C-alpha cells in the first residue's frame, strides 16, 4: 500500500490527511471500522482526485466527511429498497456513479468494492465486483488510468 500512497502523492491530487480524531469520529458515526487499506489511506490523505482535477476528475476518492451509504449517495433515500445499509459510496466516478465499499463482507480482512452504477443500482446483476480490496482498486486505477468499466482489461 505504501507504494500506492507515494504515487498518489507524487502524480495525483491528494487532500490533506485525516487526523486520528477525524478517523475515530467517522468510525463512531458509521458503526464500522476502516480496514487496513483504508486505515493506511486516510491518515495519508483524506480523499484524492485521481488522474486530473475537478471538473472532469474520473475518480474522486471521497473524504471521510462525504462518505455516506450508497443508497443515499446514489438514490438520495436511506431506504432498504435502494440497497443494503452496509454499502457505502467511497469513490465518485462521474455522472452519479460511484465505487461502493461493502462493509457487510470482508475478504482477507478487507472490504470488497462494487460498481455503484446510478442506472442499475442496486441490482447485483449489473452492479458487480470492481475489486476485492481498496488497494486492488487503487492499483488498478493508477495502473490503467482508465474509467471504471475498463479496470479489469
What are these regions (language model features)?
Residues 1-98, 149-153:
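A surface-exposed partner-binding patch
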Residues 85-86, 115-117:
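Secondary-structure boundary/capping motif
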Residues 91, 102, 114:
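Residues in well-ordered beta-strands of folded domains
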Residues 97-105:
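Broad, structure-driven detector of short, well-ordered beta-strand segments within folded domains
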Residues 106-110:
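A short alpha->loop->secondary-structure connector
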Residues 116-138, 142:
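Compact, glycine/acidic-enriched structural inserts
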Amino acid at each position: 500500500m505504501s507504494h500506492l500512497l507515494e504515487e498518489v502523492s507524487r502524480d495525483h491530487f491528494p487532500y490533506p490527511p485525516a487526523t486520528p480524531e477525524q478517523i475515530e469520529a467517522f468510525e463512531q458515526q458509521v458503526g464500522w471500522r476502516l480496514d487496513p487499506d483504508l486505515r493506511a489511506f486516510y491518515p495519508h490523505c483524506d480523499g484524492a482526485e485521481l488522474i486530473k482535477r475537478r471538473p472532469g476528475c474520473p475518480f474522486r476518492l471521497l473524504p471521510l466527511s462525504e462518505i455516506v451509504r450508497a443508497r443515499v449517495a446514489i438514490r438520495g433515500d436511506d431506504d432498504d429498497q435502494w440497497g443494503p445499509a452496509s454499502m457505502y459510496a467511497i469513490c465518485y466516478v462521474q455522472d452519479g456513479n460511484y465505487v461502493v465499499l461493502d462493509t457487510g463482507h470482508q475478504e482477507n480482512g478487507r472490504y470488497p468494492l462494487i460498481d455503484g452504477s446510478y442506472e442499475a443500482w442496486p441490482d447485483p446483476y449489473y452492479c458487480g465486483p470492481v475489486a476485492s480490496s481498496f488497494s486492488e482498486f487503487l492499483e488498478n486505477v493508477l495502473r490503467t488510468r482508465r474509467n471504471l468499466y475498463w479496470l479489469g482489461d
